[in-house]
From Swiss-Prot:
Lineage: Bacteria, Bacillati, Chloroflexota, Chloroflexia, Chloroflexales
Biological source species: Chloroflexus aggregans (strain MD-66 / DSM 9485)
Pathway: Amino-acid biosynthesis; L-histidine biosynthesis; L-histidine from 5-phospho-alpha-D-ribose 1-diphosphate: step 6/9
Pfam families xrefs: IGPD
Protein name listed in UniProt: Imidazoleglycerol-phosphate dehydratase
Enzyme Commission code: 4.2.1.19
Protein's gene: hisB
Family: Belongs to the imidazoleglycerol-phosphate dehydratase family.
The keyword Amino-acid biosynthesis is annotated on this UniProt entry: yes
Top-level taxonomic group: Bacteria
Substrates-to-products reaction catalysed: D-erythro-1-(imidazol-4-yl)glycerol 3-phosphate = 3-(imidazol-4-yl)-2-oxopropyl phosphate + H2O
Length: 205
């Protein structure tokens, strides 16, 4: 496996390149963006969800992924989310001055989702969601929890996600991705009251 990571010091931006025997992914994330997204993974529903994540989080996100979709979507979807988490971690730098913790409730028609995050450097993921169908488009619903876990663990943050209720699996997943974007938007913002200090009594994240 070959990985090359580069960060741009003049902005909270990172590019991650990941190449394995199964996939090739190039992903660029700008935290302080405007919600622009250009996603091409070969998995239409994943493209849609990441576009929503960027739009509602006001992140700029570009993804180019090529994977062994003749096998299934698992490797490609997983590696894209690994890269997304690593890009977020790298773009945040020391995390000095950020709000750090935030949450968001997002409805999508009959479905309601909650996502809470803590960018404190301790990776964890709790997902509570039940899906009635095995797939939405080209993406298996059994992968949804694993994708959020991949983002959280590689992004070094704590993520709790819950679908409180709903009937349509597309709506449930869409609400989750929107809520995740909005929670991360709030948590990554600078709080001027911190004066650029680390938001932890330990002095390091």
């Amino acid at each position: 496996m070959n990985e090359a990571n580069s960060a741009m010091s003049d902005a909270r931006r990172a590019t991650i390149e990941r190449t394995t025997g199964e996939t090739s992914v190039t992903l660029t994330l700008t935290i302080d963006g405007s919600g622009r997204a250009d996603i091409q993974t070969g998995i239409g529903f994943l493209d849609h969800m990441l576009t929503l994540w960027a739009k509602h989080g006001l992140f700029d996100l570009t993804v180019r992924a090529h994977g062994d979709l003749h096998v299934d979507e698992h490797h490609t979807a997983e590696d894209v989310c690994i890269c997304l988490g690593r890009a977020l971690d790298q773009a945040l730098g020391t995390r000095a001055g950020i709000v750090r913790t935030a949450h968001s409730f997002v409805p999508m028609d009959e479905a309601l989702a909650l996502v809470a995050v803590d960018l404190g450097g301790r990776p964890y993921c709790v997902m509570q969601a039940e899906f009635a169908t095995p797939r939405v488009g080209q993406l298996g619903t059994d992968l949804i929890g694993h994708l959020f876990e991949s983002i959280a663990f590689n992004g070094r943050f704590n993520l709790h996600a819950q679908v409180l209720y709903g009937r349509n699996d597309h709506h449930k997943i869409e609400a989750l991705f929107k809520a995740c974007g909005r929670a991360l938007d709030a948590a990554t913002r600078y709080d001027p009251r911190l004066g650029g200090t680390i938001p932890s009594t330990k002095g390091v994240l």
